[in-house]
Amino acid sequence: GWRTIEGVEGLSEEAELYRFYFKNGKPYHAEKGLELFTIDSRKYAFNTKGEMQTGKKVVNLEDGNVANFYFDEEGVMKTGKQVIFDEDLGETQNWYFHTDGSRKGQGFHGIKDNVLYVYGLRQEADKDLRFAPVELNGNQYLVNSNGAVQKATSSSKSNAMPELGSGYKDFKDENDKVWTVNTEGVIQSQNTAQ
């Protein structure tokens, strides 16, 4: 079962508590890094010392890869949209974690509901610039400050590159850069406005 143990004086922060899960007298622990364990149908991460993890963590997967996961204060793996405060950056970030299947809990990598995520983190333009290029799987996409992929309609035309014909659209940022995108949101060119 669960055990809470206070940290060792001089090695841990004062009054720091660590949670462990023991089965047959041994704590669940990772062979290396962090690994997932299922307890009462919920997933938790433990390090090599057996300490339960909380917050956003990079976890070792069974296939040898790693992925971003997020664990609440109780250590339970979270899924779906999560708003996470990054203490290092001093800012709130938007994340999305798979909600089902073999990747449940892993940071989503791709475009979901027209929003672009890289390993779970929503990619977004600086509010000052309005638009920013983001690379995903070998393509450059244009996103706005909410992470939405900017796309052309099938009938729209680019003024910057009229030779492309229909299915292209221009977006101008605050630095007078003009981004031309196709109907998928893939950047075709970047020019400076005349």
Label each PLM-derived region with a short phrase.
Residues 1-194:
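Extracellular adhesion/carbohydrate-binding repeat motifs centered on closely spaced tryptophans
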